[in-house]
């Protein structure tokens, strides 16, 4: 009992960021142009101080504890990091920049070998618990320059690099790179603003696995999830897993994206944006392409803003995503002692459609108090997997939301928040296609022991509370402690019902 109390106290005061925001983050949260894809709009952000800018730098450390988590996460995880941000106005030029570094470690981890499980329409699983360490570096730089009275041009570049390592067989090392470039333009006339921007983005991640211990390779199995936890289970270096193939010693994934967005604003009271992005992803390299997964994303945002004793805005967002995953029919042909890959065709084995509609509103008083309410009115996910003659389908409808309220008095600022998530509809089925014949083949293999807890964690009803207290020492220096508790309900497959998080932050605003 005493040990549990100590863990709770430690978790309450030490963890990942969940509480109050800096002035820089508040500006990013409340301003339409900083929420849009048009960096040229930062010239429209007003400043009411002589410094014409806001900046911050912060050190942080944290811990998470509890068994209410995705099966690929750790019961106990801890980390630390540093971050900084700045937004500055010069006579004709405005600049935005952010930087962050973080390290997170979890013990007794296994499951998904990717840095962010669920990022792709496939996944790789290993089953030997061990410690994993994730390091992430990221920066963003943006610039907007005014040309005359009507035009502003700008550009933004974002870069993120991450490395992920497990130190126990099956050992694996991941490297991820994410680079995006967004040029933009803004036209200004009286109270009207019209903008346009382009997006070019490249994402890549590779998984390199190895075995150093004396055990035979047959002692370690892996699973390639091709959709809805259906797939191939073999020894980790088997040909069906693609972790150790002839000529390839890693599992690489590459995604190239391009698209554009249009923005409009009327008197800074009514603003809107619509964006379209097309992505082409593939797994494999050197001609050995195992999967190809194109994706289309359409998003829209509308914001209403008004003033008075409480400055308030309402923002409505929609995002629709459609993805298909094609598995190639691939062979190796040897000629003259040289082995080359030959692709005979491809089969669509997985489809995914996601729609999300959300609303958020914030109100800020002139005395330093305020509230932020976020509600996801609908989140409808449809997924299907085909392994002839069987067809699996999953349909889910979720709702979630969170609420925060803060108040400043003297050097203190207190923040209290609550959140929830629940499933409104959930149906999973496996059927035989009408033209599948009378002699039914065996059902496709499913990693049920991982599917059930993962599915439950994503859909289980839950609610959470969070509390943060910040003390301002003067001259911009501050210290903050924060903590949160999440509790799940109606659980059957997860090992725990709660997770606690907390953290300490020390920073400077200037």
Regions found by a protein language model. Give the residues of each.
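Outer-membrane beta-barrel channels and translocator barrels
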Residues: 90-93, 146-150, 188-190, 265-269, ...
